[in-house]
Amino acid sequence: MGVLVKNLVEDLKLEVLNKGKDDIELNISDINRPGLQFSGFYNYFANERVQLIGKTEWSFLDVMSPELRKKRVAKFFQFETPCVIITRNLKPHKEVLENSRKYNRWLLNTSNISTRFTSKLMNYLDEKLAPETRLHGVLVDVYGIGILITGESGIGKSETALELIKRGHRLVADDAVDIKEIEGKLIGSSPYVTSGMLEVRGLGIIDVPSLYGLSSVLDIKTIGVIIHLEQWKKDQDYDRLGIDEINRDILNVPVRKITLPIRPGRNIAVIIEAAAANYRYNLNSNSSPVDTIGARMKEENLKNK
């Protein structure tokens, strides 16, 4: 689903110079600067994009003769475009305003300069148009790493998150995690209704920022690791060295997945802290603890020869 232009106007606080149809949508985040079109070039025209008229395009129109400007602008507006945005609060030329009305096109204005507004608009559209999904789990920030805790209901995900919050880490989402893929990264957040809330079985729903302060919650976080909790299975062969790297694909983005078996006496919160610290260490290191042990074993073997 695309972004309605009328919502774009509201969210980015744009001035409406001419109102188009309410059902016009933006479906891509790219932007077109129509300088070539104003010069008469239409061999390729990305008319499905937002059309941005900055100082350069405005000045180009300004130096044209009235007859030529009338012809070029009329040709431009004959193409279906979602909206035309003029930056720097530049006053639209009469021909631009008249043709936007004639063809019922959205004509908007912003006080921002072109480069700043382009960045703002593309970031906005990237977020709104990003592929998204909702997963069952808990998302927390541990040592700056986004940890998505998954597992069957009642396994202890929320209780583990509560222990992590008590230890100074931050909650992003509990129970339902909204995830968007933006530029190859998975950005997790909480649905509005449950934002800042944590459900603990037997205790009920607790308001995390009210109990632990505003610093105990985050609005969004990039997901770095998935920690999957499951009941301990005696015959299951669990990874003991950390060399079996398993990934889970979310929105076609691979994420490192670590399975932690639950059994009495295991402090899952502490283990998750270690997993986050180890993940951050591996991001900046060329060797793992297993490599270090292997090197030491070689040293011992050489000594014993």
Curated annotation (Swiss-Prot):
Cofactor(s) the protein requires to work: Mg(2+)
Superkingdom as given in the UniProt entry: Bacteria
A single GO molecular function term of this UniProt record: ATP binding
Binding residues annotated for Mg(2+), in chain numbering: 158, 199
Residues that coordinate or bind ATP: 151-158
A single GO BP: regulation of carbohydrate metabolic process
Region of interest: Important for the catalytic mechanism of both phosphorylation and dephosphorylation: 198-207
EC code: 2.7.11.-, 2.7.4.-
Pfam families linked to this entry: Hpr_kinase_C, Hpr_kinase_N
Reaction(s) this enzyme catalyzes, per UniProt: [HPr protein]-L-serine + ATP = [HPr protein]-O-phospho-L-serine + ADP + H(+); [HPr protein]-O-phospho-L-serine + phosphate + H(+) = [HPr protein]-L-serine + diphosphate
Ranges where the record places region Important for the catalytic mechanism of dephosphorylation: 261-266
Active-site residues, Swiss-Prot/TrEMBL: 136, 157, 175, 240
The entry's keywords: ATP-binding, Carbohydrate metabolism, Kinase, Magnesium, Metal-binding, Multifunctional enzyme, Nucleotide-binding, Serine/threonine-protein kinase, Transferase
NCBIfam families: hpr-ser
Misc. comment: Both phosphorylation and phosphorolysis are carried out by the same active site and suggest a common mechanism for both reactions.
Recorded domain comment: The Walker A ATP-binding motif also binds Pi and PPi.
Summary of subunit composition and partner proteins: Homohexamer.
Primary role: Catalyzes the ATP- as well as the pyrophosphate-dependent phosphorylation of a specific serine residue in HPr, a phosphocarrier protein of the phosphoenolpyruvate-dependent sugar phosphotransferase system (PTS). HprK/P also catalyzes the pyrophosphate-producing, inorganic phosphate-dependent dephosphorylation (phosphorolysis) of seryl-phosphorylated HPr (P-Ser-HPr).
Record-linked PANTHER family: HPR KINASE_PHOSPHORYLASE, PROTEIN YJDM-RELATED
Family: Belongs to the HPrK/P family.
Designated name of the protein: HPr kinase/phosphorylase
Organism annotation: Clostridium tetani (strain Massachusetts / E88)
Underlying gene: hprK
